[in-house]
């Protein structure tokens, strides 16, 4: 039996609630999924989480799996989406909290634990609320480029295609939007 057929059988068994069959799918594809995550640049500290999130999502979506298509491709599509989610989350944190690189976010608190303390969580929520309300004060064009690139995670060419602009126009709007946002946030801080 070829691997694709074995995957189809295991997926069908798992979809009917057979956890052992799903465990075999995890064993068959977990290492390759982790290697893919590393190749996409996912930090080692997040690889296991991405793999676990992928398999949890796959377990919940087994009824949607089309047995006429390869299970591995379906699973890796879910994994790729989880990796993109992680990048989006980190990009938003980086943009909103101004870390020079994503590693600075974990080191900024000066503690070994990655989990922020209660004071840091409250401060982060307050800062996020402040930035979100300030985004609403930007003109539509500025808000669109910031949301598409910094929050949704689109590249400048993707944002340009969505907005019907040239890449240079998007670059210019991003620069102006960041300057406006920074000025609004500074003015808000002085109040």
UniProtKB/Swiss-Prot annotation:
<dbReference type="InterPro" id="IPR013325">
    <property type="entry name" value="RNA_pol_sigma_r2"/>
</dbReference>
<dbReference type="InterPro" id="IPR039425">
    <property type="entry name" value="RNA_pol_sigma-70-like"/>
</dbReference>
<keyword id="KW-0804">Transcription</keyword>
<keyword id="KW-0805">Transcription regulation</keyword>
<dbReference type="InterPro" id="IPR007627">
    <property type="entry name" value="RNA_pol_sigma70_r2"/>
</dbReference>
<keyword id="KW-0170">Cobalt</keyword>
<comment type="function">
    <text>Sigma factors are initiation factors that promote the attachment of RNA polymerase to specific initiation sites and are then released. This sigma factor regulates the genes for a membrane-located efflux system that confers resistance to nickel and cobalt.</text>
</comment>
<feature type="short sequence motif" description="Polymerase core binding">
    <location>
        <begin position="49"/>
        <end position="62"/>
    </location>
</feature>
<feature type="DNA-binding region" description="H-T-H motif">
    <location>
        <begin position="156"/>
        <end position="175"/>
    </location>
</feature>
<dbReference type="InterPro" id="IPR014284">
    <property type="entry name" value="RNA_pol_sigma-70_dom"/>
</dbReference>
<dbReference type="InterPro" id="IPR036388">
    <property type="entry name" value="WH-like_DNA-bd_sf"/>
</dbReference>
<comment type="similarity">
    <text>Belongs to the sigma-70 factor family. ECF subfamily.</text>
</comment>
<keyword id="KW-0533">Nickel</keyword>
<comment type="function">
    <text>CnrH alone is able to activate CNR expression, while both CnrY and CrnX are needed for nickel induction of cnrH. Binds DNA in an RNA polymerase-dependent fashion. CnrH may be controlled by a CnrYX transmembrane anti-sigma factor complex which binds CnrH in the absence of Ni(2+). If Ni(2+) appears in the periplasm, it may be bound by CnrR (CnrX); the signal then would be transmitted by CnrY into the cytoplasm and CnrH would be released.</text>
</comment>
<protein>
    <recommendedName>
        <fullName>RNA polymerase sigma factor CnrH</fullName>
    </recommendedName>
</protein>
<dbReference type="InterPro" id="IPR013249">
    <property type="entry name" value="RNA_pol_sigma70_r4_t2"/>
</dbReference>
<dbReference type="GO" id="GO:0003677">
    <property type="term" value="F:DNA binding"/>
</dbReference>
<keyword id="KW-0614">Plasmid</keyword>
<dbReference type="Pfam" id="PF04542">
    <property type="entry name" value="Sigma70_r2"/>
</dbReference>
<dbReference type="InterPro" id="IPR000838">
    <property type="entry name" value="RNA_pol_sigma70_ECF_CS"/>
</dbReference>
<dbReference type="GO" id="GO:0016987">
    <property type="term" value="F:sigma factor activity"/>
</dbReference>
<dbReference type="Pfam" id="PF08281">
    <property type="entry name" value="Sigma70_r4_2"/>
</dbReference>
<keyword id="KW-0731">Sigma factor</keyword>
<dbReference type="InterPro" id="IPR013324">
    <property type="entry name" value="RNA_pol_sigma_r3/r4-like"/>
</dbReference>
<keyword id="KW-0238">DNA-binding</keyword>
<dbReference type="GO" id="GO:0006352">
    <property type="term" value="P:DNA-templated transcription initiation"/>
</dbReference>
